[in-house]
């Protein structure tokens, strides 16, 4: 699974990229539901959210 860190700028680039809808808007940053996140396995070669994040604030946990 992945997690969005405090460096998130709330740009929303990641949310529509998630094939399993694991990303949602939190109060100040976007949140990954780690119980839903599949690391895009079976969908993409790499996590889609990581690929589009302009500030590289999404980390593997």
Curated annotation (Swiss-Prot):
[4Fe-4S] cluster 2 binds at residues 18, 37, 40, 49. Gene3D superfamilies: 3.30.70.20. The keyword Secreted does not apply. It holds the Pfam family Fer4. Keywords: 4Fe-4S, Electron transport, Iron, Iron-sulfur, Metal-binding, Repeat, Transport. InterPro entries: 4Fe4S_Fe-S-bd, 4Fe4S_Fe_S_CS. Its cofactor is [4Fe-4S] cluster. Ferredoxins are iron-sulfur proteins that transfer electrons in a wide variety of metabolic reactions. It comes from Chlorobium limicola. This is Ferredoxin-2. The keyword Cell division does not apply. It comes from the Bacteria. SUPFAM superfamilies: 4Fe-4S ferredoxins. Binds 2 [4Fe-4S] clusters. [4Fe-4S] cluster 1 binds at residues 8, 11, 14, 53. Residues 2-27, 28-61 form the 4Fe-4S ferredoxin-type domain. GO terms for molecular function: 4 iron, 4 sulfur cluster binding; metal ion binding.
């Amino acid at each position: 699974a992945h997690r969005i860190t405090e460096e998130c700028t709330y740009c929303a680039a990641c949310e529509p990229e998630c094939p399993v809808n694991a990303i949602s808007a939190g109060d100040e940053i976007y949140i990954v539901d780690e119980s839903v996140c599949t690391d895009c396995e079976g969908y993409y070669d790499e996590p889609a959210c990581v690929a589009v994040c302009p500030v590289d604030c999404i980390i593997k946990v």
